[in-house]
């Protein structure tokens, strides 16, 4: 069974924080809460589902979407930029997303058949996750009215310079080109748009082998061996976006750490989350 769907959503008069800077006065900064936030989401969704046939069922889902806004979080809008100039891809925008899953139940075979009893109750599950990367805004620090505004300005985009450079010595095999960006004079924002650069995508396959043992009429014991990122595909975090950083344009960690797994207080196991290295887990579950 196949289906195609469209999803659209719009947000108006959303609450955002803007930052004014009167300079060297008793209050160097003034935070303004306004309702100038705007958002828009458009998506085309495709899905194919194969019903259970001879122990096999599968599903494939693909989404082509674009999320646009002028502020994706409760952080301040960038300095010196009216709301309309901050309009761009959302921080969490994912243009292409694919998920494919399959589940197989081994057929029941008579115990007299060789290996028949050994295969009874076994099943396998596999899931493929793949998506394009999140967008980032390149930012720089500037002096204005005697105050250092840290990572508050977008630079100018230098015409004719490639955004990315191939470099086998860095994670992902490429890094942003510093020569493609030129610092501006505060308080003016540069010509580079907000979230104009898409970073590294993600792809991984998770796999599980399981067997169920029937203990009572309603009680069952399930054994599972699970492999996360089965093929150990490297997924990298976004490139460092601060122009004055010594590692500007390079990814410095794996994706699972960027998403919060393994960070202090997150409560998440870093190796068992999306974007981490290959890891195995054995579980035993009683169902009733």
Feature-to-residue mapping (PLM):
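Short, solvent-exposed micro-motifs at the edges of structured domains
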Residues: 1-288
């Amino acid at each position: 069974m196949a289906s195609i769907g469209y999803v659209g959503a719009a947000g108006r008069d959303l609450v955002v924080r803007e930052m004014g800077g009167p300079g060297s006065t008793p209050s160097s900064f003034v935070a303004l809460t306004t309702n100038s936030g705007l958002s828009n989401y458009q998506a085309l969704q495709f899905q194919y589902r194969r019903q259970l046939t001879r122990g096999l069922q599968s599903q494939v889902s693909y989404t082509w979407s674009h999320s646009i806004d002028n502020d994706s979080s409760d952080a301040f809008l960038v300095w010196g930029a009216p709301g309309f100039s901050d309009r761009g891809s959302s921080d969490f925008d994912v243009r292409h997303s694919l998920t494919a899953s399959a589940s197989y139940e081994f057929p029941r075979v008579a115990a007299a058949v060789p290996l028949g009893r050994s295969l009874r109750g076994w099943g396998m599950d596999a899931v493929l996750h793949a998506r394009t990367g999140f967008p980032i805004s390149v930012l720089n620090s500037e002096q204005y009215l005697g105050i250092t505004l840290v990572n508050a300005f977008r630079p100018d985009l230098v015409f004719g310079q490639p955004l990315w450079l191939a470099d086998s010595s860095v994670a992902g095999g490429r890094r942003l080109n510093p020569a493609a960006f030129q610092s501006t004079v505060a308080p003016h924002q540069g010509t580079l748009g907000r979230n104009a650069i898409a970073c590294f995508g993600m792809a991984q396959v998770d796999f599980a082998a399981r067997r169920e043992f029937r203990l009572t009429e309603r009680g069952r014991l399930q054994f599972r061996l699970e492999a996360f990122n089965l093929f150990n595909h490297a997924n990298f975090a976004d490139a460092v976006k601060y122009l004055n950083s010594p590692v500007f344009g390079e990814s410095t960690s794996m994706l699972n750490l960027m998403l919060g797994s393994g960070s202090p207080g997150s409560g998440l196991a870093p190796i068992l989350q999306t974007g981490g290295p290959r890891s195995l887990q054995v579980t035993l579950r009683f169902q009733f």
